[in-house]
């Protein structure tokens, strides 16, 4: 938790994992909005993942991942046209997305960071440096 905002991290990176995540989110009581920060490797079924969890998300943010298999937030955004995340802001990396979303969120909201082990590792680094 950061300033009254629940932060959830999930390494799932396929539609099956996203469906399980959506089911879990649906059973958790929370008072506010749900923000999602999503970053995924270029070889993943990003549209299938977003579609599976979309019903649980109020606001989206996309982030880029470095590395040979990574992709920029803009490339991810292009692959998500027509999805619930089509209007999401793009952030250079997970750390900048975490900062931006936590600045926007209010106590009682929850922030989900998901899409890859790389995404969660970058989020953990950002969260630890923010404390």
Where are the regions a protein language model picked out?
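Nucleotide phosphate-binding/pyrophosphate-handling subdomain across enzymes
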Residues: 1-59
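Active-site-proximal loop/hinge segments that shape catalytic or ion-binding/gating pockets
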Residues: 116
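Active-site-adjacent alpha-helix immediately C-terminal to a catalytic or transition-state-stabilizing loop
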Residues: 121-131
